[in-house]
Amino acid sequence: MAKLHDYYKDEVVKKLMTEFNYNSVMQVPRVEKITLNMGVGEAIADKKLLDNAAADLTAISGQKPLITKARKSVAGFKIRQGYPIGCKVTLRGERMWEFFERLITIAVPRIRDFRGLSAKSFDGRGNYSMGVREQIIFPEIDYDKVDRVRGLDITITTTAKSDEEGRALLAAFDFPFRK
């Protein structure tokens, strides 16, 4: 079992129960899933780019990504409905906790000019979204084999009812928010 999951069950639950005066352990917010999304708009011209992006996402997450397709045709972007334009992975359970631990301890501190993550990136329902400009911050990606530096979106979905609860949950994991 991931260390962070044990830490959540042993420490974070108790801390949040006293902070928010919950009556039941089931009221305490928890991390439900983590979604990684990589938009590869250039895949319209070169299909190999999408394969490389999917390979990067597989290395980062340890799970085969789902190829996302365009929902509707947009003439300005020269895309048609059904064109493959990105890939995404939804992590739950053990893989989610392992990724979350690697994200906090290894990947985020490797971001160039890192001063902390914005605490304003909550969606109003306790879910946190962040963008990463370079996939090479993850140690699973071999810098020499990267054909192009790509960014990805990371969404942490929680069961929190408000941004305040979500922020408290992530802060309990020592999430590096900007002061």
UniProtKB/Swiss-Prot annotation:
Q: Might you report a single GO cellular component term?
A: ribosome
Q: Which SUPFAM superfamilies match?
A: RL5-like
InterPro entries tied to this protein: Ribosomal_uL5, Ribosomal_uL5_bac-type, Ribosomal_uL5_C, Ribosomal_uL5_CS, Ribosomal_uL5_dom_sf, Ribosomal_uL5_N
Q: What is the lineage of its organism?
A: Bacteria, Pseudomonadati, Pseudomonadota, Gammaproteobacteria, Enterobacterales
Q: What name does UniProt use for this protein?
A: Large ribosomal subunit protein uL5
Pfam family, any one: Ribosomal_L5
Instruction: Write down the PANTHER family for this protein, in alphabetical order.
Output: 60S RIBOSOMAL PROTEIN L11-RELATED
Report the SS bond pairs.
Answer: none
Gene Ontology terms, MF aspect:
rRNA binding; structural constituent of ribosome; tRNA binding
Family of the protein in this entry: Belongs to the universal ribosomal protein uL5 family.
The gene that this protein is the product of is rplE
UniProt keywords, alphabetically: Ribonucleoprotein, Ribosomal protein, RNA-binding, rRNA-binding, tRNA-binding
Quaternary structure and interacting proteins, as annotated:
Part of the 50S ribosomal subunit; part of the 5S rRNA/L5/L18/L25 subcomplex. Contacts the 5S rRNA and the P site tRNA. Forms a bridge to the 30S subunit in the 70S ribosome.
Q: Has the keyword Ribonucleoprotein been applied to this entry?
A: yes
**In which domain of life is the source organism classified?**
Bacteria
UniProt-listed GO biological process terms: translation
Q: Does the keyword Repeat apply?
A: no
The job of this chain, per UniProt, is described as: This is one of the proteins that bind and probably mediate the attachment of the 5S RNA into the large ribosomal subunit, where it forms part of the central protuberance. In the 70S ribosome it contacts protein S13 of the 30S subunit (bridge B1b), connecting the 2 subunits; this bridge is implicated in subunit movement. Contacts the P site tRNA; the 5S rRNA and some of its associated proteins might help stabilize positioning of ribosome-bound tRNAs.
